[in-house]
């Protein structure tokens, strides 16, 4: 148990273009070394490219892509006796969103395209179409949870 008190969650300011907290969270995840202006440029260019390619609204593309990435269940380690079991559990909404954004940026960075703008745009399009690395990761997490269903009664 933590010895210190509860740390309150910080409020996230909505971004200036789409007035969305979700966009700010994605930009913050893209940001490296505090370079927020660069992260914003990367995100806005990528979302414009992706929405132009799909012929949809930018926010529709982002929300659709994240919906296809966010996991519903995951496994968590639980020690019972001398054994450690992977217990499948439902994912809280805040964590679902956080994991979705994390995987989106992580798999965009791992892609082979030349610039981060192209990588992120391609990953957004892939995620929107239910393909790509981030969606594979979600499916893998779901498979793990399905495989460990017999241990579901160890929930806490």
Curated annotation (Swiss-Prot):
Function statement: One of the primary rRNA binding proteins, it binds directly to 16S rRNA where it nucleates assembly of the head domain of the 30S subunit. Is located at the subunit interface close to the decoding center, probably blocks exit of the E-site tRNA.
Keywords: Ribonucleoprotein, Ribosomal protein, RNA-binding, rRNA-binding, tRNA-binding
Entries under SUPFAM superfamilies matching the protein: Ribosomal protein S7 (SSF47973)
Family, per entry: Belongs to the universal ribosomal protein uS7 family.
Official protein name in the record: Small ribosomal subunit protein uS7
Entry GO MF terms: rRNA binding; structural constituent of ribosome; tRNA binding
Entry annotated with the keyword rRNA-binding: yes
Species in which this protein is naturally found: Symbiobacterium thermophilum (strain DSM 24528 / JCM 14929 / IAM 14863 / T)
